[in-house]
Regions:
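Residues on the lipid-exposed face of transmembrane beta-strands in outer-membrane beta-barrel proteins
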Residues: 78-84, 98-100, 141-149, 162-166, ...
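Bacterial Sec-dependent N-terminal signal peptides
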Residues: 1-34, 239, 243
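Glycine- and aromatic-enriched membrane insertion/assembly motifs of diderm outer-membrane
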Residues: 50, 59-60, 68-126
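Extracellular/periplasm-exposed beta-strand and loop segments of Gram-negative cell-envelope proteins
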Residues: 64-71, 106-136, 169-197
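Residues that define the transmembrane beta-barrel architecture of outer-membrane proteins
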Residues: 47-49, 70-76, 92, 135-141, ...
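Short glycine/proline- and aromatic-enriched beta-strand/turn motifs that initiate or cap beta-hairpins
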Residues: 29-83, 242-244
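Predominantly the C-terminal beta-signal and adjacent terminal strand-loop region
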Residues: 40, 46, 187-244
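Short loop/turn motifs that connect adjacent beta-strands in outer-membrane beta-barrel proteins
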Residues: 37-49, 85-92, 150-158
Length: 244
């Protein structure tokens, strides 16, 4: 009799195990798994506006009588500025960097040569010349103080930047065509190689106005053929764009 009861107990045990396995399987399937959201890292130690590009209209100030500009005298510059915030909110900063710039001037200040090869500066009427222009390429060293109302969550903000720029003119060229002779003066030694002046830029998001004024004259102690001092300075007005 004892032997005949053993299979029944074994069968009951087997069915009990199957029931428990099925129960836990159904329970685990109905269990709601929490949704895993991706972790977004926020850089609270951000820096702003470290690359720049500008387009300007170039003017000459402190000009002698009769000097005028014609056409569009364009200027281009680009460079890098290291942004160094000085407060916890990073709304104030100092920036210093390195850049390159190109300036072109169409005007009636002519540079020619006399019979001995000496340079002659004169202010001529436009009906006396076919074309006349001066251009220079420079390495720029800007340093500026910055204010902006930026946050690490937005790339759109107001800004006002003001600073001082020191430039070295590593290449200059003037071309005069008076209808009879073309004079090309390359790397004129009378040009101030080192030029400096204050600048300011201000705007919102992409669009920012820019202005630079040269403090020292474009030429060193030069007089025109009529005896007028040539103390012209540069003035650049235009737009500047910042990225990163």
């Amino acid at each position: 009799l004892k032997t005949s009861l053993k299979p029944k107990h074994n069968m009951r045990f087997l069915f009990s195990c199957l029931f428990l396995v099925s129960f836990f399987s159904v329970f685990s399937q109905e269990e709601v798994k929490p949704k895993i959201e991706p972790v977004i890292k926020i850089d609270s130690l951000y820096r702003e506006d470290q690359f720049y590009f500008s387009v300007t209209y170039n003017l000459l100030s402190d000009i002698p009588k009769g000097l005028r500009q014609d056409k569009f005298s364009a200027g281009l510059s680009l460079g890098f500025l290291r942004d160094m915030p000085i407060n916890k909110k990073r709304t104030f900063a100092i920036a210093a960097g390195l850049g390159l710039s190109y300036q072109n001037f169409f005007q009636n200040l002519t540079i020619s040569k006399d019979g001995n090869g000496a340079l002659v500066y004169a202010v001529n009427d436009y009906n006396e010349i076919v074309s006349n222009k001066y251009r220079q390429y420079m390495v720029d060293l800007p340093i500026e103080f910055r204010w902006r109302n930026s946050t690490y969550e937005s790339t759109k903000f107001w800004r006002i930047y003001a600073g001082l720029k020191l430039s070295y003119a590593f290449s200059t060229k003037s071309i005069l065509d008076d209808g009879e002779t073309t004079y090309k003066i390359v790397n004129n030694s009378d040009v101030n190689k080192f030029q400096y002046g204050p600048y300011i830029s201000a705007g919102y998001n992409t669009w920012n106005v820019y202005m630079y004024y040269g403090l020292n004259p474009l030429f060193n102690n030069i007089k025109t053929a009529s005896g007028s001092s040539l103390d012209v300075k540069t003035l650049n007005i235009g737009l500047i764009f910042y990225i990163l």
